[in-house]
């Protein structure tokens, strides 16, 4: 009788409770049962393969058939006194056997430092620890290639890895929890390089759910929901851009941003196709930046993308993560900055995503009065929990580092800052000081901004914050939130209300166009004419303009010139640059045919190109956006004529006079005060024939004399076309 035969039955079966937990999928330490274990003068190898017909342990050239104990557990006792290198040959009914290294013989792939930093919320490169990562280990029998998986689910009864590799069986790949960290981990040899997977989580609530990886770098194309192992081999070509970016401060640079929803800009294009077509379009029309509506994976293609289900994965609808890198790279090499919308305020309740991840409120706040956003039917992140805060801060760094993103536009900041945001009187709980401010969210935003700006000098963070919260763009070192800029929602609402009115009524609402200057320098502002203004029955900018098509076109041109002249950076949603007439549709995309059918659309598009070019070439329009020294009124009070006029001042001493006639009629012989006498060149006239206007103007310029007017030492007499803007500079 061989020594192996003598050992048959020795220690083969684990403790009954261990086997029961394995079968139930709720064992916290399957590695303590499975794999190779020393028992005095012999070793027992156990493998859990519930659907296998036969399992053989291979040691060197020797083969040892394993005994089926019960419920898919196989075991064999071997006469060795030291842990050995071995493989498993596994056979299933009606299939060829295959040989693989045993997943349960490998040490944890996360170290104590990773787990400690995560528990404290300070792991800035958390995506390198959690999620799915291809790895290789050198053994006596050669190199073992595979993928390590790690997921945070501290309250789960058990977690298993499922995927194509095991026929989506929840029993063959149980994971182990690493100490008290709540992180479950498993290295699986020979896992496919781009394999699909999920985690089967036995929740604390008794519910078994199949979950996408919160740290997945890639996903299936929706509506499928599996995560995909993803490795980047992209070679960047934007080194010059990245070097120069680190030396710049966007607050003091020109920023004219084209806001894009990738799926509907030109439907059907991939990231690689967009890298050519979108880049060429943006360059041709002289924008400095693009802002992409949320690129992170989201379940509903017909949405803007603000309900994110995979925060670390660019949507797979348009290609792979490396394809998205190619888009960013192409834009950078063309001199275009890339901002992405980022959504840390809330997340959807899809049962396969983050919500109730381990059967308890994990990523979301446990108090329903803080953990749910009623308006949107979503969960709200628990900003006070270190691991959740770490998940989000690391995510911001991930997009900036891994995709060379130049900025994050943070969505729905107001909903984060106020505990009573859009809640009934009895639907919220106060903070520790009995106030309505969400102190944990404030701390999170400060940490995110400080960390991002330290890690990547030259990037921009922009808040969509619709209230008067003080210090949104103040540095965190003096108590601010630390954003670079915030959207000026007040300017947007007042301006659109004004220009939507018939000109004969505008004089009664003149204050709507002057009020913004009372607070224009209280924060660093972006002036948004965004996607929010072209949905839900709001129509389009074109549709808001009163009158005939000729009048609408003139009104839109003057509005855009006013936006570009006003202190603040510019943002314009796609389609508005050529006066799209129909409201946005994710199915139809933009109405590019308008450029073939009417001169008004071409005129507006030509104007946008020209004002972008003029804007970038004249620092008076951008270098002092955030300081009163960059702006002075000529006349803020000519409501009778519906005229506004002001000067923009550059940090180099340059000046631009900006005059707006929002009346529906021409003003001839209009005297305007100017800072110096002499020739003033007409830099822009929105009524010019090249913009399909009527051609009324000043023949390219005016001569200012030393006649004081409007409190200025000089003045000139101008012709102001109806619904127009004029920009003048000293010749």
Curated annotation (Swiss-Prot):
InterPro entries tied to this protein: A-amylase/branching_C, Branching_enzy, GlgB, GlgB_N, GlgB_N_E_set_prok, Glyco_hydro_13_cat_dom, Glyco_hydro_13_N, Glyco_hydro_b
Stretches of the chain forming a coiled coil according to its record: none
Record flagged with keyword Transferase: yes
Entry's EC annotation: 2.4.1.18
GO biological process, alphabetically ordered: glycogen biosynthetic process
Function of the protein: Catalyzes the formation of the alpha-1,6-glucosidic linkages in glycogen by scission of a 1,4-alpha-linked oligosaccharide from growing alpha-1,4-glucan chains and the subsequent attachment of the oligosaccharide to the alpha-1,6 position.
UniProt similarity note: Belongs to the glycosyl hydrolase 13 family. GlgB subfamily.
Assembly description: Monomer.
Name of the featured protein: 1,4-alpha-glucan branching enzyme GlgB
Lineage: Bacteria, Bacillati, Actinomycetota, Actinomycetes, Mycobacteriales
């Amino acid at each position: 009788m061989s020594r192996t035969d003598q050992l048959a039955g020795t220690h083969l079966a684990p403790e009954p409770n261990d086997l029961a937990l394995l079968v139930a999928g709720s064992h916290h330490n399957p590695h303590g049962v499975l794999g190779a274990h020393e028992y005095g003068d012999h070793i027992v190898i156990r493998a859990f393969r519930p659907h296998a017909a036969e399992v053989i342990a291979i040691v060197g050239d020797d083969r040892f058939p394993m005994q089926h104990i019960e419920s898919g557990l196989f075991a064999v006792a071997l006469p060795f006194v030291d842990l050995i290198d071995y493989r498993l040959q596994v056979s299933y009914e009606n299939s060829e056997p295959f040989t693989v290294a045993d997943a349960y013989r490998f040490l944890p792939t996360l170290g104590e430092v990773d787990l400690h930093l995560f528990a404290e919320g300070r792991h800035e490169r958390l995506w390198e620890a959690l999620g799915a990562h291809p790895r290789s280990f050198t053994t006596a029998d050669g190199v073992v290639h595979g993928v390590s998986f790690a997921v945070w689910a501290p309250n789960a009864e058990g977690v298993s890895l499922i995927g194509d590799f095991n026929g989506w069986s929840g029993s063959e790949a149980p994971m182990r929890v690493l100490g008290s960290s709540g992180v479950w981990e498993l290295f699986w040899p020979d896992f496919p390089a781009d394999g699909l997977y999920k985690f089967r989580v036995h929740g604390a609530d008794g519910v078994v759910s199949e979950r996408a990886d919160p740290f997945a770098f890639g996903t299936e194309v929706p509506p499928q929901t599996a995560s995909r192992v993803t490795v980047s081999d992209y070679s960047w070509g934007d080194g010059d851009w990245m070097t120069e970016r680190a030396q710049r401060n966007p607050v003091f640079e020109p920023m004219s941003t084209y806001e894009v929803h990738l799926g509907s800009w030109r439907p059907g294009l991939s990231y690689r196709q967009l890298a050519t077509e979108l880049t060429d379009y943006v360059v041709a029309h002289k924008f400095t930046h693009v802002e992409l509506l949320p690129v992170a994976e989201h379940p509903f293609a017909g949405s803007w993308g603000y309900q994110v289900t995979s925060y670390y994965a660019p949507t797979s609808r348009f290609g792979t993560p490396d394809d998205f890198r190619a888009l960013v790279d192409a834009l950078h090499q063309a001199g275009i900055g890339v901002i992405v919308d980022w959504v840390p305020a809330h997340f959807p309740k899809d049962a396969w995503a983050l919500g109730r991840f381990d059967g308890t409120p994990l990523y979301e706040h446990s108090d329903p009065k803080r953990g749910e956003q009623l308006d949107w039917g979503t969960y709200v992140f628990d900003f006070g929990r270190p691991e959740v805060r770490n998940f989000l801060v690391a995510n911001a760094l991930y997009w900036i580092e891994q995709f060379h993103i130049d900025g994050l536009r943070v969505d729905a900041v107001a909903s984060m800052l106020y505990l009573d945001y859009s809640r009934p009187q009895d639907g919220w709980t106060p903070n520790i000081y009995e106030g309505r401010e969400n102190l944990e969210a404030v701390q999170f935003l400060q940490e995110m901004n400080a960390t991002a700006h330290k890690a990547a000098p030259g990037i921009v963070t922009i808040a969509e914050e619709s209230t008067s919260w003080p210090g949104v763009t103040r540095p965190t070192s003096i108590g601010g939130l630390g954003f670079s800029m915030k959207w000026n929602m007040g300017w947007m609402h007042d301006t659109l209300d004004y220009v939507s009115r018939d000109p004969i009524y505008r004089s009664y609402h003149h204050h709507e166009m002057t009020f913004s200057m009372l607070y224009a320098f209280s924060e660093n502002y972006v002036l948004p004419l965004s996607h929010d203004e072209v949905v839900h029955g709001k129509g389009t900018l074109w549709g808001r303009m009163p009158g005939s098509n000729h009048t609408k076109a003139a009104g839109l041109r003057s509005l855009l010139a006013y936006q570009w002249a006003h202190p603040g950076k510019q943002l314009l949603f796609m389609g508005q640059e050529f006066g799209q007439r129909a409201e946005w549709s994710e199915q139809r995309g933009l109405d590019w045919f308008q450029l073939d059918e009417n001169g008004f659309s071409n005129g507006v598009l030509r104007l946008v190109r020209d004002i972008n070019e003029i804007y970038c070439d004249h620092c008076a329009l951008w270098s002092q956006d955030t300081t009163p020294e960059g702006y002075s009124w000529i006349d803020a009070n000519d409501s009778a004529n519906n005229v506004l006029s002001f000067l923009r001042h550059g940090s180099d001493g340059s000046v631009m006079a900006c005059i707006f006639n929002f009346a529906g009629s021409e003003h001839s012989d209009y005297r305007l005060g100017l800072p110096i006498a002499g020739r003033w060149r007409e830099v822009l006239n929105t009524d010019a024939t090249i913009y399909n206007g009527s051609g009324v103007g000043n023949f390219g310029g005016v001569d200012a004399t030393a006649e004081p007017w409007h409190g200025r030492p000089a003045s000139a007499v101008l012709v102001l076309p109806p619904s127009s803007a004029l920009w003048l500079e000293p010749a």
